[in-house]
Amino acid sequence: MKKVGLRVDVDTFSGTREGVPQLLELFDKYNIQASFFFSVGPDNMGRHLWRLLRPKFLWKMLRSNAASLYGWDILLAGTAWPGRNIARALGPLMKLTAQAGHEVGLHAWDHQGWQAKVGRWSEAQLMQQVQLGVDALANSTGQPVKCSAVAGWRADTRVLEVKQRFGFHYNSDCRGTHPFRPVLSDGRLGTVQIPVTLPTFDEVIGSEVSMNDFNDYILREIENDRGVPVYTIHTEVEGMSQAAMFEQLLLRAQRQGIEFCPLSALLPQDLASLPLGRVERAPFPGREGWLGCQTDVKDDS
């Protein structure tokens, strides 16, 4: 069996209300455990529309047929009206996810705000965003928050140093090839990172691959991954508009000997055996703007 970490990003109110129950049902049907990362504060995702002025983001929205993929409820959230607080209304679904045996972690307090502003927020603002998210998720699930994955992979060393204070068991804040121990600015080692290694649906659809051929494409990518494969899905896509296609992917993956698992299951017992690395800003195929990306560091110890 080839073990693949399955990360579920929950970005929006609709994705929580509609996509989470659909995925919980699917995972129960196929006996799959995954890692869910919840956005818990205001759903302001519609405020991303100003990014249509940027050619790369406009092309992404056009090639993925975003209106059909996400629906206008998601695309306009938090524009003409205040964004709905996700955990306040839908916290029981977060608790249900944990009770079903899935790993539950923090994605963001304000997903859109993090993606748009993290690069210019002060340290105090970063701390506040993480603290608000941790408090809301812990109140919803009734258990401590032990892992996190920042919105849009917008992380760098400064973000990692802020998150260090929350005592997470691991973070999944960047793109890369294998788990590692990040080196912080003062030379200390930060919380273990488990990078996402595989392309997401919205990064490649309409450019690298057609809708009909996506499952073939991602299964090849999984088989060819020579690192520690981690695949990210979104409740707004694989749990809603593309749920039928995703179920076919799960069926085919089982037949090919692919075992999906929570991200923590990818870690060795001895975390000190993991290589060193850094999280640095870099452009990334299929995405607009910078992402946190893994770079290797030689261990001279």
From Swiss-Prot:
GO terms for biological process: 4-amino-4-deoxy-alpha-L-arabinopyranosyl undecaprenyl phosphate biosynthetic process; lipid A biosynthetic process; lipopolysaccharide biosynthetic process; response to antibiotic. Transmembrane segments: none annotated. Disulfide bonds: none annotated. InterPro entries: ArnD (IPR023557), Glyco_hydro/deAcase_b/a-brl (IPR011330), NODB_dom (IPR002509), Polysacc_deacetylase_ArnD (IPR050248). Keywords: Antibiotic resistance, Hydrolase, Lipid A biosynthesis, Lipid biosynthesis, Lipid metabolism, Lipopolysaccharide biosynthesis. The keyword Thylakoid does not apply. It holds the Pfam family Polysacc_deac_1. Residues 2-261 form the NodB homology domain. Pathway: Glycolipid biosynthesis; 4-amino-4-deoxy-alpha-L-arabinose undecaprenyl phosphate biosynthesis; 4-amino-4-deoxy-alpha-L-arabinose undecaprenyl phosphate from UDP-4-deoxy-4-formamido-beta-L-arabinose and undecaprenyl phosphate: step 2/2; Bacterial outer membrane biogenesis; lipopolysaccharide biosynthesis. One of its GO terms (cellular component) is membrane. It catalyses: 4-deoxy-4-formamido-alpha-L-arabinopyranosyl di-trans,octa-cis-undecaprenyl phosphate + H2O = 4-amino-4-deoxy-alpha-L-arabinopyranosyl di-trans,octa-cis-undecaprenyl phosphate + formate. Its EC number is 3.5.1.n3. It is an enzyme of class 3 (hydrolase). One of its GO terms (molecular function) is hydrolase activity, acting on carbon-nitrogen (but not peptide) bonds, in linear amides. Belongs to the polysaccharide deacetylase family. ArnD deformylase subfamily. PANTHER family: 4-DEOXY-4-FORMAMIDO-L-ARABINOSE-PHOSPHOUNDECAPRENOL DEFORMYLASE ARND-RELATED, GLYCOSYL TRANSFERASE-RELATED. NCBIfam families: PRK15394.1. Catalyzes the deformylation of 4-deoxy-4-formamido-L-arabinose-phosphoundecaprenol to 4-amino-4-deoxy-L-arabinose-phosphoundecaprenol. The modified arabinose is attached to lipid A and is required for resistance to polymyxin and cationic antimicrobial peptides. This is Probable 4-deoxy-4-formamido-L-arabinose-phosphoundecaprenol deformylase ArnD. It comes from Serratia proteamaculans (strain 568). The lineage of its organism: Bacteria, Pseudomonadati, Pseudomonadota, Gammaproteobacteria, Enterobacterales.
